[in-house]
Design a protein with these regions (language model features):
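Residue-level preference for the first positions of well-ordered beta-strands
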Residues: 1-2, 59
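Short glycine-rich, Thr/Ser-proximal phosphate-binding strand/loop in the N-terminal lobe
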Residues: 2-45
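Short amphipathic alpha-helical segments, especially helix-boundary/capping motifs
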Residues: 17-21, 48-52, 90-93
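Conserved active-site "lid/cap" helical segment
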Residues: 42-58
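Short beta-strand-loop/turn "lid" adjacent to the catalytic site in phosphate-handling enzymes
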Residues: 53-106
Length: 106
């Protein structure tokens, strides 16, 4: 299963996919003071609440506009899921060419 996490300035939204099917999703505050362990306990609780086990997660993707939250989330993925997440952000090569005068403004 794929765990996706999107960190916004106010809220973070996480979802779990089985193939193309969204199994469940959760919204929580983008708290900059949370540790990797706090994120890990929360994610484990949410998975359990949905009848899932962390061992079912095989891949993780994270996008974030809040850099201070990204580091503990990545540590959480490695510690609690033993998975190095794919971080979607600036510099990720996805095979698309941006033909804007200033692509950084997008």
């Amino acid at each position: 299963m794929l765990l996706v996490i999107d960190v916004g300035n106010t809220n973070t939204v996480a979802g779990i996919y089985d193939g193309k099917k969204l199994v469940d999703n959760w919204r929580f505050s983008s708290d900059r003071s949370k540790t990797a362990d706090e994120f890990g306990m929360f994610m484990n609780s949410m998975l359990n609440f949905s009848g899932l086990k962390k061992e079912q997660v095989t891949d993780i993707i994270i996008s974030s506009v809040v850099p201070p939250v990204l580091v503990p989330l990545c540590h959480m993925c490695e510690r609690y899921f033993n998975i190095k997440p794919l971080v979607v952000g600036q510099g990720l090569k996805i095979g698309l060419q941006l033909r804007y005068e200033n692509p950084k403004e997008i």
